[in-house]
């Protein structure tokens, strides 16, 4: 245990701007921030997810692929790049067919994404299963997430059962978990 090292996942470029600025940081503004990140030593930087791809296109008239590629080229592998996905819904609000998931994940990995953190708000295994399989199969790292709340009607076994289901389906293996 003496060799253990603290690894930090930074969410600023995804959740920080999403929560504070309605995901409206332009590419020019992101570019000004990247030199500070380059040598920060973050294990993972979560740079996409939620509303990022939609907002970048809809409100800023920019390409989310250019954003991802620019961040990747600046970081030069110093930090893994991550996105938060709603599983079968990707970054939208409706489920997409497998061929859309596959094409999207191929493009994301090609443009520099390393890790896809995947969740379903209702912990429905069927909504995350295909995404996890695709990301792993395309050479990315699937990072399965479980949603939980602190409430008397939700006991800890509810959440551990969900995790066990993901393991049972072969979606998560201990050797694939991110430390």
Place the predicted regions along the sequence by residue.
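Short glycine-rich or small-residue beta-strand-to-loop segments that form or flank ligand, phosphate
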Residues: 13, 20, 115-119
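Conserved, mostly hydrophobic/aromatic
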Residues: 8, 16, 37, 118
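Short, basic, glycine/proline-bearing loop/turn elements
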Residues: 17-20, 51
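Short, polar loop/linker segments at the starts of domains and inter-domain junctions
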Residues: 19-27
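Active-site beta->alpha loop and helix N-cap motifs at the rims of alpha/beta catalytic domains
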Residues: 44, 49-179
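Basic/polar N-terminal segments that are highly enriched at the extreme N-terminus
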Residues: 1-4, 164
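Short catalytic helix/loop segments, enriched in acidic residues and glycine
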Residues: 26-37
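Acidic, glycine/proline-rich low-complexity segments that act as flexible tails and inter-domain linkers
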Residues: 2, 10, 14-15, 23
């Amino acid at each position: 245990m003496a060799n253990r090292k603290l690894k930090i996942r930074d969410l600023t470029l995804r959740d920080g701007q999403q929560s504070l600025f309605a995901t409206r940081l332009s590419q020019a503004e992101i570019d000004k921030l990247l030199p500070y990140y380059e040598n920060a030593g973050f294990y993972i930087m979560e740079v996409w997810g939620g509303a990022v791809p939609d907002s970048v296109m809809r409100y800023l008239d920019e390409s989310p692929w250019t954003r991802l590629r620019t961040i990747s080229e600046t970081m030069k592998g110093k930090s893994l790049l991550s996105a938060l996905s709603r599983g079968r819904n990707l970054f939208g609000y409706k489920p997409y067919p497998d061929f859309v998931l596959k094409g999207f994940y191929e493009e994301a990995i090609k443009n520099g994404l390393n890790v896809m953190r995947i969740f379903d708000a209702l912990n429905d295994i069927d909504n995350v299963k295909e995404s996890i399989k695709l990301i792993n199969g395309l050479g990315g790292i699937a990072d399965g997430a479980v949603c939980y709340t602190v409430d008397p009607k939700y006991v800890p076994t509810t959440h551990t059962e969900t995790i066990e289901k993901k393991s049972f389906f072969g979606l998560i293996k201990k050797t694939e978990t991110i430390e």
